[in-house]
């Protein structure tokens, strides 16, 4: 500090810790319960037959608390007579015995409890910087912000990694709360293009493509693995519902008793796929899905027609088969969840003390 007048404070820190988690372990998981069930049909003696059955859940003696390991390296600093302050951190989280649901063949009959078969990794970094200063006798101001990046991956769940379309909370090899779907390949603009698409992909498809329901202006999807079919093998990773980037910044000033502050907040690298029924988010994803159903108006004037070939939406339909095909999870139907908003504005005046 004596040799650097601009440096007021500097601290480097490192930490390691382990925390436990028992979420998913019930009180009686280690005990197998049974129940008596009376049967219909013939009597055995004076009463109908009774069987002893499990309660639908298999006991497990091998479960234990998760042990989550946290690593952190940080830097705290203060510069220029403490006008500039901030912190910077990098961190990593490891969970090598994550409690997850394990899938077994249906012939097992009962549901298996959670097991410590998961392996999870998470890492990221965060920076926070603030600047405050004074101009003249009465005017002071401050400005600051935070920026963080986080990503994670479920590296192992003890199961075969088969991609499934839509929102998937746990998928081996991908972040938590991932979204998977088809890759959009444009709209069928001409009858020739429509027929060519049907000729290539109608046979053997598992994505809801039918000749009678595939219209001009409907969506087309890519054969990602080039096997001549459109099926689950063409499903790709589209993003995660958890934002990888979060940020905020604030500005404020004070002058002769008046003060003003503004706080902005936002997120980026988030993918949204709206699911639900007619009373839920699906009315935002599928406009005019059903008669007399409230919907948003962003699609009005933006649906395909021979005179409006550059439209974003296919022609309206309330036929489920058509909507299920066009609006299934794909790089077209997901949305960018990035945003920035003015979270708070505060204007005040402090009465002078007598």
For each feature predicted by the language model, list its residue ranges:
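Solvent-exposed loop/turn elements at secondary-structure boundaries
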Residues: 2-67, 85, 89-120, 158-164, ...
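Extracytoplasmic gating/loop element in the C-terminal half of outer-membrane beta-barrel translocons
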Residues: 267-354
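Residues on the lipid-exposed face of transmembrane beta-strands in outer-membrane beta-barrel proteins
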Residues: 1, 14, 73-77, 88, ...
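Outer-membrane beta-barrel domain signature, especially the mid-to-C-terminal portions
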Residues: 54-62, 96-119, 151-183, 218-244, ...
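Outer-envelope beta-barrel architecture signal
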Residues: 6-10, 82-84, 137-143, 245-247, ...
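Conserved small-residue
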Residues: 26-28, 36, 115, 132-239, ...
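Outer-membrane beta-barrel signature, preferentially recognizing the C-terminal barrel domain
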Residues: 40-85, 113-136, 173-190, 240-245
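Transmembrane beta-strands of outer-membrane beta-barrel pores
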Residues: 16-20, 90-96, 131-133, 147-153, ...
């Amino acid at each position: 500090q004596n040799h650097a007048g601009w440096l007021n404070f500097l601290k480097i820190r490192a930490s390691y810790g382990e925390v436990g988690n028992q979420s998913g372990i019930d009180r009686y998981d280690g005990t197998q319960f049974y129940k008596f069930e009376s049967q219909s049909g013939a009597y055995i003696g004076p009463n109908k037959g009774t069987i002893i059955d499990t309660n639908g859940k298999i006991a497990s003696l091998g479960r234990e608390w998760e042990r989550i390991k946290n690593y952190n390296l940080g830097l705290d600093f203060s510069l220029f007579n403490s006008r500039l302050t901030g912190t910077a951190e990098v961190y990593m989280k490891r969970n090598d015995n994550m409690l997850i649901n394990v899938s077994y063949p249906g012939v097992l009959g009962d549901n298996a409890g959670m097991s410590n078969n998961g392996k999870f990794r998470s890492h990221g970094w965060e920076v926070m910087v603030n600047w405050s200063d004074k101009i003249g006798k009465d005017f002071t101001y401050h400005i600051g912000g935070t920026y963080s990046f986080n990503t994670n991956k479920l590296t192992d769940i003890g199961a075969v990694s088969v991609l499934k379309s839509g929102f998937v909370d746990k998928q081996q090899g991908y972040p938590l709360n991932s979204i998977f779907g088809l890759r959009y390949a444009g709209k069928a603009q001409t009858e020739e293009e429509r027929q060519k698409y049907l000729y290539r992909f109608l046979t053997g498809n598992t994505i809801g493509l039918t000749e009678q329901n595939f219209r001009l202006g409907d969506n087309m999807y890519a054969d990602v693995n080039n096997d001549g079919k459109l099926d689950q093998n063409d499903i790709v990773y589209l993003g995660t519902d958890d934002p990888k980037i979060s940020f905020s910044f604030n500005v404020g000033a004070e002058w002769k008793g008046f003060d003003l502050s503004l706080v902005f907040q936002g997120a980026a690298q988030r993918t949204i796929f709206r699911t639900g029924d007619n009373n839920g988010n699906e009315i935002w994803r599928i406009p005019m899905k059903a008669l007399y159903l409230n919907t948003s108006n962003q699609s009005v004037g933006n649906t395909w027609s021979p005179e409006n070939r550059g439209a974003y939406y296919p022609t309206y339909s309330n036929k489920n088969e058509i909507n299920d095909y066009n609006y299934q999870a794909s790089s077209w139907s997901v949305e960018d969840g990035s945003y920035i908003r003015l979270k708070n504005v505060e204007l005040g005046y402090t009465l002078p003390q007598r």
